[in-house]
Amino acid sequence: MILVVNLNPSLDKIYTLDELPYGEASRAQTVQNTAGGKGTHVANVITALGSPCTVVGFLGGYVGQYIRHVLDKRRIVHHCTTIEGETRSCINIATSDGKQTEVLEPGPTITEGEKTEFLAQYDFELKRSDLVVASGSLPKGIGDDFYKELICRAKAQGKPFLLDTSGSALTKGLEALPYFIKPNESEVEVLTGHKLTNLNEAVQVLHELEGRGIAMPTISLGKKGALLAHEGKVYRAVPPTVDTVINAVGSGDSFVAGLATALDRGASPEEALRLAAACGTANVLEAESGVVDPEKVAAIEKEVQITTL
């Protein structure tokens, strides 16, 4: 069973308008409300692929109740810590000229008591899990080294920890040597101090990360696919070209979910990378973020090209 850590979930609201004139009232043509947060997306995809998972994290207020309702509706098991604050909302305003304006709420501040309660629940669920996936940013109040603590607790029980985050949360998390990380090209630049200009440089970074003790470092290359290193070998996945991208938000989360699902099933690194790439590509074919159609995933999976570099 996969344990999904979703510390900073959100209600994602998407408004579509013809235009957004500054300082005037605007009437939306459509409104879409979805349970968001990278961990929510991961849980959606793992469940769609037919694997069991449990979500832990923080939820509070009316938004928290809504997210619990969505998880229940999708039959995703969740044991989230109830907090006094209100779970954040993220608003995306899309206009007919193709531009998008986002308003991101700061989110709640987690208290020391809520943090302690979460850790107790995490330790309990950890015993029943085979693999841990932690995705997304950290809420205020718990410190940049919180993922590092979760990784250490998982490693103490021999559970692989897949970390997908950025910034100081990633930098601190790396100190505990998670099993897997998935920075994109810009995040690699932050980690290493230099910009990647070719595949050879990316391969070298992966070897360096593996040499530090990260068992399966991965670099996301966007439309160009992804690179994954394991036991001295580097694999590249190139997914098929998609004619029409409906919504690319959540593709990275879908990638992580596919990889976690495959690893939980005992797949080889190549097989895991293939499913991950297929899930990331399948996500762009859906209107809702972090959602895949298993039949589309299976079809795309056959077309993903895996090579050894």
Give names to the regions the model predicted.
Residues E102-L104, S129-G136, D164, K182-E187:
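Short beta-strands and strand-loop turn motifs
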Residues M1-V56, V63-Y66:
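Glycine-rich phosphate/adenosyl-contacting loop at the front of the ribokinase-like
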Residues T111-E149, P160:
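Hydrophobic alpha-helical segments and helix pairs
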Residues E24, A48-S129, A298-L309:
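Conserved N-terminal subdomain of the carbohydrate kinase-like
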Residues P108-T111, L138-I142, A169-T171, V190, ...:
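Short, small-residue-enriched loops and turns at beta-alpha junctions
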